[in-house]
Amino acid sequence: MKNHFEDFIHRRVKKPSSQEVQEILSIFFEKKLDKGAIFKEGYTVIKKLGFLVNGSARTYFTNDKGDEITDEIVQKNNFLSDIISVRTGKKSPIVIEILEQSTVLVANMDRVWDLLDRNVTFNILIREYIGDRAMVLLKRHFMFLNGTAKERYQYILETNPEILQKFPLKYVASMIGVTPTQLSRIRKEK
């Protein structure tokens, strides 16, 4: 399974040092997680970084009313992380839940920080990941500020149509800021 991660590194980093790639791979161990497993509990400090080899997960938080608000659905070849907790070293409300049988490569954050101090390839890889996350989040932010629920749904339809077929619509509704009933109406209008 580390072959998938190694391929991912080579796609994301131009001419990575093979020694540095091996160092990166060495801090990760493979873990099989069942549907419903929690990779990171809410209101905790993240202790590990994951790379989703196959399967899927979602990040969510619970609002003041007790409703789960899905932030994102993460699919294979992506990192599992809570950037708020990683960046601040503090507790964050984000929960990372596994949505189906998944294989995750896991590294303890102590080893991640240590490797980031000395491995240029890993630095580039993580910088690229954070840059990509920032772009996605900014696009979503602008859509929430300027767009309608219908436009947010259309964006998911265009960028991640498999999400609509594969996962409960309550997650999608939550991601675009509507109720499941409102999402049904939007879908019927299409």
Regions found by a protein language model. Give the residues of each.
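Cyclic-nucleotide recognition modules
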Residues: 70-127
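Phosphate-/nucleic-acid-contacting segments
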Residues: 147-190
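Glycine- and acidic-residue-biased ligand/ion/polar-headgroup-sensing regions
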Residues: 47-58, 76-77
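Short phosphate-coordinating micro-motif centered on Lys-Gly-acidic
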Residues: 39-44
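A cytosolic small-molecule/anion-sensing beta-strand core signal
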Residues: 34, 53-54, 75, 100
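Short beta-strand segments in beta-sandwich/barrel cores
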Residues: 29, 56-61, 79, 103-104
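Cyclic nucleotide-binding regulatory module and flanking cytosolic helices
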Residues: 1-29, 85
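Short, Lys/Arg-enriched N-terminal segment that forms or immediately precedes the first helix
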Residues: 6, 133-142
